[in-house]
């Protein structure tokens, strides 16, 4: 009975869980309306099989009419509930939530009268009774009319038997046990429960078949699981069926009359069925069998229900998190909620801004795309046109004529051009401001708490937008100040370098002029020496001796003359379909050691890049130079060698340095590097031919990509005659002014590049970082300045939201309770089932294998032989053929079973103490 009580609690929990999973109101009144079929017991049998007597035995009171005049003519449903405080004789009838104490005889006569009145008609109205006693298990008993009556059809049976959890009680009288295979009740049970997982067989009226050996043999075969194949998977229980009536008739006011009757019933059954398992005899065995079947059915449903509850719990928690906490009905609570919502909004804002969600990537896109493009599109060509530069310089009030010192005009030009950078900077600030405003709107929409209070959401967006406007104004002031800073102060060193470079140009021109005149003098002296030297007439001539003496004294000059007479060949290699790739060795000056390293250089004219490797066989460049923003100029060997150590000079010798083999590659933008971290790349060719070819090709690439070439290298590429003409020309004022404008443009471009790098930093500082740090403070200060009435008007919760929150809170509480209860019941039910299966191995229909049809017929033949053969089924002459496997020393698990259901591999707890705990 205790097991039934636990199953009743489990059934109630499962009913509430089903209501929750069906999204019904978790209130007990509404969930109780959902029918629970796990504790339903449907009695199936023919007229006179003893169905009502068996149900009376379960109730503990003769409530249902029995006998010929009490045949069931309509379905009778008795909903039982157990109350231990009642006496064993008390019966409480519940009608419309009202309790009325009645007697068993009064209920029986009332039911008999109703059945008699309805016998004339063909009505199928059910009779429903709700009883509360201390003797009955909490089950719902359904007594159907006899299956052989005309009023019984498939729809009436299916209405109650089709539920997956309803227990089917197949009632067969002992006198018809030998004909069990043809029982209609068994066929119907097999139709609705093919695996017999919710079927219990009852053999009633054992006392009436005590004198029929054949019937007793068939009963013992069924109880010993040796019946026909269709009965071996059904647990069978034997009952007398009249124990309750006998106890009621013989009761003399004792509370133990029912227990006495049930013990008497068990003793009578033991004396009649001497070879049957004792665990299958009597009313107590019936209750245990019902509990086992109900537990098995519930165990199948529990995992799915628990899984559904876990998923439902997650859904409920997500909804509660989305709906938020309940609003506190006070001024302080309302203000606290407002500040907490500001905190939630700020978290979402930072997530969108710093985490890259939403439109955060547009800030970086503005810095890397739109703003640099606007800087590059500034009309520098128009401002640095020679005519415009000349006009500005002429209009400026310089200290000296502009050809000598046009400093003031050039300063004015620099300020005018840098003024153009203010508009792109302001546009960059406006773009970032629009992005931040979009992020504010997206963050407000993504904040769950603000969604519940639309007026407060609009207020938060307005406060945040006003704060962003202030940050935007500060950022505009900052970027304009950056531009004005560059405009206001042009370093004097820039103009000093202009003069220095002009003087350097003049010095180089003088050097080139001196070199050309020296070459002419050397050529004239060589011709004079050849003309004055005598021809060698013989070996003893004086001229010959003088020539030989000169050859001995000047062997090196002779070798040099031979080298001059032999034309040099370039060592560079070309490749590609159009010869666009040039490769060869160059000496690269190291910045660390100040020494020269021989490297393999490769120039790609299509890509405009110069790369080098340590060896010719290497495939990956150690460094590359982009020639687009570079300039090339020739430097003297003295400048290239001045950083060499004296040790290197001694090792190379006095004549190791070649004449004019060094040139330098630099970047037109002062703060940029050419190669790795170096601002200049100093190279030295192996010969003058290689140098000229390298310089010509590098100049070609640089000029094709908009670069500029140093003046020295340009003059070096000209012929000597044209160079002399250029040196002898007077200074061209326009050429000088053009050169100065180019220098000033280089400075302006460097400043613009610097602004392109620094303006985004100012924008990030004044707008992005400022909004990260001060957004919450702005919200807090603005909300704190609002009055209580204004805040309460802004934070008004929707009533629908409030009702939904209350509903989900109830569901959450009930879900946690049901999950805990069902988990405990699942473990207990599994443990109890495992213990029951282990302890009842001898009598369990699923542990013993089903007997064949031949064994079934032998049992009838032995019963028909006479009393001597029947003794073999008693306790003294127990037959080994039909005896229990445990008594034969056989392993019950090894017998050939038909459909054995294994129990879970879980260790059960210690079994409960049996004895007086079964009061009923």
From Swiss-Prot:
Residues 523-545, 833-849 have a biased composition (Polar residues). It is found in: Cytoplasm, Cytoskeleton; Cytoplasmic vesicle, Clathrin-coated vesicle; Cell membrane. Residues 737-830 form the GED domain. Residues 238-241 are annotated as: G5 motif. Residues 507-522, 548-567, 641-652 have a biased composition (Basic and acidic residues). Residues 71-73 are annotated as: G2 motif. It catalyses: GTP + H2O = GDP + phosphate + H(+). Residues 747-761 are annotated as: Important for homodimerization. Residues 45-52 are annotated as: G1 motif. Its EC number is 3.6.5.5. Residues 204-207 are annotated as: G4 motif. Residues 788-812 form a coiled coil. The modification N-acetylmethionine is found at residue 1. PROSITE patterns: G_DYNAMIN_1 (PS00410), G_DYNAMIN_2 (PS51718), GED (PS51388), PH_DOMAIN (PS50003). Putative microtubule-associated force-producing protein, able to bind and hydrolyze GTP. Collaboratively with DRP1A, participates in clathrin-coated vesicle formation during endocytosis. With DRP1A and PIP5K3, required for the precise coordination of polar ARAC3/ROP6 and ARAC4/ROP2 placement and subsequent root hair positioning during planar polarity formation in root hair-forming cells. This is Dynamin-2B. It comes from Arabidopsis thaliana (Mouse-ear cress). The gene is DRP2B.
């Amino acid at each position: 009975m205790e097991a039934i009580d636990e199953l009743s609690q489990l059934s109630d929990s499962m009913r509430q869980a089903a209501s929750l999973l069906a999204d019904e109101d978790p209130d007990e009144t509404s969930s109780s309306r959902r029918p629970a079929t796990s504790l339903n017991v449907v009695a199936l049998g023919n007229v006179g099989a003893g169905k009502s007597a068996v149900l009376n035995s379960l109730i503990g009171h003769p409530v249902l009419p029995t006998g010929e005049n009490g045949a069931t003519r309509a379905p009778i449903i008795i909903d039982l509930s157990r109350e231990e405080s009642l006496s064993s004789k008390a019966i409480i009838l519940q009608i419309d939530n009202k309790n009325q104490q009645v007697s068993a005889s009064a209920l029986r006569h009332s039911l008999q009268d109703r059945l008699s009145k309805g016998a004339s008609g063909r009505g199928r109205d059910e009779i429903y009774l709700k009883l509360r006693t201390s003797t009955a298990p909490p089950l719902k008993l359904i007594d159907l009319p006899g299956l052989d009556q005309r009023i019984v059809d498939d729809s009436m049976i299916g209405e109650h038997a089709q539920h997956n959890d309803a227990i089917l009680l197949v009632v067969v009288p002992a006198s018809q046990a030998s004909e069990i295979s043809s029982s209609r009740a068994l066929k119907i049970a097999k139709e609705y429960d093919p695996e017999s997982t919710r079927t219990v067989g009852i053999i009633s009226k054992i006392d009436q078949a005590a004198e029929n050996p054949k019937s007793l043999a068939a009963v013992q075969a069924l109880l010993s699981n040796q019946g026909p194949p269709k009965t071996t998977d059904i647990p069978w229980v034997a009952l007398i069926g009249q124990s309750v009536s006998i106890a009621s008739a013989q009761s003399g006011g004792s509370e133990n009359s029912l227990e006495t009757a049930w013990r008497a019933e068990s003793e009578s059954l033991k004396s009649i069925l001497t070879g049957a398992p004792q665990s299958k005899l009597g009313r107590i065995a019936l209750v245990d069998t019902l509990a086992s079947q109900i537990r098995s059915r519930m165990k199948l449903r529990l995992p799915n229900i628990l899984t559904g509850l876990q998923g439902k719990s997650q859904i409920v928690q997500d909804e509660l998190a989305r709906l938020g906490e309940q609003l506190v009905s006070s001024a302080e609570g309302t203000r606290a909620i407002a500040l907490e919502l500001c905190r939630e909004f700020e978290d979402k804002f930072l997530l969108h801004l710093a985490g890259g969600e939403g439109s955060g990537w547009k800030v970086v896109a503005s810095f890397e795309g739109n703003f640099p493009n606007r800087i590059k599109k500034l009309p520098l060509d128009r401002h640095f046109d020679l005519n415009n530069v000349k006009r500005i310089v002429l209009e400026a009030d310089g200290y000296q004529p502009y050809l000598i010192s046009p400093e003031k005009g050039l300063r004015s030009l620099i300020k005018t051009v840098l003024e153009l950078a203010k508009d792109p900077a302001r546009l960059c600030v406006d773009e970032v401001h629009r992005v931040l405003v979009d992020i504010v709107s997206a963050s407000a929409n993504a904040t769950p708490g603000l969604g519940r209070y639309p007026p407060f959401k609009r207020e938060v967006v307005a406060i945040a937008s006003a704060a962003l406007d202030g940050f935007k104004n500060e950022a505009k002031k900052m970027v304009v100040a950056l531009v004005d800073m560059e405009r206001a102060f042009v370093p004097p060193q820039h103009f000093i370098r202009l003069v220095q470079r002009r003087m350097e140009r003049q010095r180089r021109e003088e050097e080139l002029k001196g070199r050309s005149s020296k070459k002419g003098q050397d050529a004239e002296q060589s011709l004079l020496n050849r003309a004055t030297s005598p021809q060698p007439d013989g070996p003893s001539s004086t001229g010959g001796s003088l020539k030989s003496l000169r050859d001995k004294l000047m062997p090196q000059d002779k070798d040099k003359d031979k080298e001059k007479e032999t034309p040099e060949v370039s060592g560079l290699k070309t490749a590609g379909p159009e010869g666009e790739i040039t490769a060869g060795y160059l000496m690269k000056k190291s910045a660390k050691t100040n020494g020269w390293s021989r490297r393999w250089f490769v120039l790609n004219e299509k890509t405009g890049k110069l790369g080098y490797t340590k060896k010719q066989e290497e495939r990956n460049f150690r460094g590359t130079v982009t020639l687009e923003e570079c300039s090339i100029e020739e430097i003297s060997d003295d400048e290239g060698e001045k950083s060499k150590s004296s040790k290197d000079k001694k090792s190379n010798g006095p004549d190791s340095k070649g004449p004019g083999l060094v040139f330098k590659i630099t970047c037109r933008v002062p703060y940029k590097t050419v190669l790795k971290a170096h601002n200049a790349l100093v190279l030295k060719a192996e010969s003058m031919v290689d140098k000229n070819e390298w310089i010509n090709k590098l100049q070609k690439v640089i000029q094709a990509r908009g670069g500029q070439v140093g003046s020295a290298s340009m003059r070096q590429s000209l012929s000597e005659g044209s160079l002399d003409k250029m040196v002898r020309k007077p200074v061209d004022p326009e050429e000088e002014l053009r050169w100065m404008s180019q220098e000033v443009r280089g400075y302006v471009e460097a400043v613009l590049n610097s602004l392109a790098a620094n303006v985004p930093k100012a924008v990030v500082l004044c707008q992005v970082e400022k909004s990260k740090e001060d957004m919450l403070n702005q919200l807090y200060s603005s909300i704190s300045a609002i009055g209580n009435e204004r805040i309460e008007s802004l934070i008004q919760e929707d009533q629908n939201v409030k009702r939904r929150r209350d509903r989900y809170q109830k569901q959450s509480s009930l879900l946690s309770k049901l999950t805990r209860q069902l988990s405990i019941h699942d473990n207990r039910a599994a443990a109890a089932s495992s213990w029951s299966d282990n302890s009842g191995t001898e009598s369990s229909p699923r542990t013993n294998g089903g007997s064949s049809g031949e064994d079934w017929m032998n049992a009838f033949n032995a019963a028909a032989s006479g009393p001597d053969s029947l003794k073999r089924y008693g306790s003294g002459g127990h037959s080994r053929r039909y005896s229990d496997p445990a008594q034969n020393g056989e392993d019950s698990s090894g017998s050939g079973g038909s459909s054995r259901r294994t129990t879970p591999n879980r260790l059960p707890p210690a079994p409960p103490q049996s004895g007086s705990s079964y009061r009923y």
